[in-house]
């Protein structure tokens, strides 16, 4: 039910109830309660209607599988941050800013309005201006030639016309909001769909505009050509292109229709580049969508560089390693430093260390012999073993028998020790193999456990915070990252070591991403790179192709301006004053002035009998230089040089249909 029909129904129902209540015999309180109930019901219906029209999006299911959300998305938000240098700087940002230049739009409107107004001047209007001038300041042929007389008026009328046209254009350009065109370019480069809204404005009053005009000629032209000025003023004041806040754009999978909402209210939109659906996945066709894979790779490399910079340049870093190769030597030194008195524990430890260092059978025998010699004084009586000379001869026979016993004892001890040591060595090797097997299993379990815990210990916002945090905070965060220690087996050695600083170099990657960004923009929008004689880039400007691709759709689809001629590319290198001067030189006014000059000169010649020197030739004297002064020639020559230097080609403007897409 529409609002108008509902209101009419409300009025009719109220009137009918009042008539019925007056004619019936019911009590006033009863009639009043019925009246209020009916009115309350109708008001509830109207309120529900308004709520439904304003909050249409809220009635959609939150997880509707039949809808592809185009915007907002994480990818597009990343694109917007890249374009405006939120985190990093790219060369593509400067190219994008050149594309957002609203000065091109202003020059286009100035050129189109000036071209339409100046070419709408009729020869009758020029002749009327001449007659008014003659009546105010007639020609008397006293020390003043007619050529000078007409030349002064022609230059004066030119300055008046250009001044009034300039005032009109400045008045129009003041109503241009630069942000609308900037957002238009941002939407095209990121999403490819431009939402917009129109405000209800009545036809603009030309009174304020006509206050900028001083001549009757331009005053009449503006009134006669209201279809030129009025649409421009109305279009500039009625269109609103929103930013990226509170905008939702989605695509219905069933109907394949795109819808756009702002604050849960449907708004119009213009599809510049239609998104595709490939393998049930929505794919954008914008320049930044084409660059997205390379931008992600480059961003990942930059984060890696930053992390390596923080990790490998930390002020204090100490690397430690075990020194097991000198442990035995230290033990021996400690034993030697102890007191020289015999100790069974010390002797036994020294004996075992000597055995572990022995690599051959002879070494083991020497170790055992030394051990026996060391402990022999404590178990054998030295007085009995070492006799004096007087008793030596008496004990000689006994010594031979004891020596045989000692040799036999040594051999038995050595044999027992060898067997025991061999048994111990075999057992040690078996235990070492078993230990290595269990160590590998434990390492695998630790690795799995640390892998599962890394997700909890790693901060997902670290990638975005590293570039923006202070150095001290970034270092503290990076130091808390999970690391895995690696154990090296005895049979392996370390082949490399990061004792020196390691930071990846991104110079080649930066240069490559800049080239890709420049290539995408230059070829998509056909921008023109201007270089000097040494081949160095001076600027990036619009070309004729760029104007047709961006400016013309903006004028037609958003401003509803269809009758402005596209500005030539060479005019983009001129100022507004030079543009007006160049348009004036190529307009019909110059030819009309020439015609009026010839006609008036013939009449003056008949009146004052002004002829050339040869009486047989009665043609009037004609000085064409008054219509071709030097400044105008300089402007035309400048345009010619620009056209030849840039090798500019002109295109035929496409015919865009009228109407907005809702």
Swiss-Prot record:
This is Portal protein. It holds the Pfam family Herpes_UL6. It is found in: Virion; Host nucleus. The keyword Lipoprotein does not apply. It comes from Human herpesvirus 6A (strain Uganda-1102). Belongs to the herpesviridae portal protein family. Keywords: Host nucleus, Viral genome packaging, Viral release from host cell, Virion. InterPro entries: Herpes_Portal (IPR002660).
